[in-house]
Amino acid sequence: MIGQNEYYGGQVRSLEFKNEQGNFTVGVMESGEWTFEAPVKEWMRLVHGSWDVQQPAGSGGWTTYREGEQFEVPGGTDFTVRVTDTVAYLCPYTGEFLGHLDM
């Protein structure tokens, strides 16, 4: 089963799925600055574009990631992503599904 998530008035959208390799979301973000909570450990892999990441959110420092790069988000933390042009990402994560799937 595939779940759908929408954030920030549709500016960020993702699909989530689970298979024998684990739990995943794959999504797209329009330009803007978006803050997310990560209740469980996850990895944000940039598939297309570039973004600046502030980890944890509000910490002051920004790191730029480009297509093909990833960063790790510890569970129980938050992060902010600053996007200047539409990006696509893959997010493997630990634990149970966080969105709309009932599996």
Predicted regions and their residues:
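Conserved short histidine dyad/triad with adjacent acidic residue
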Residues: G10, N19-P39, Y65-G75
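Short, conserved beta-strand element in jelly-roll/cupin
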Residues: A38-V53
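Mid-chain, well-packed structural core segment of small domains
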Residues: W51-V83
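Helix-adjacent hinge/juxtasegments
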Residues: Q4-G9, Q70-V73, V87-P92
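Ordered hydrophobic segments in well-structured contexts
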Residues: V26-G27, R45, A88-P92
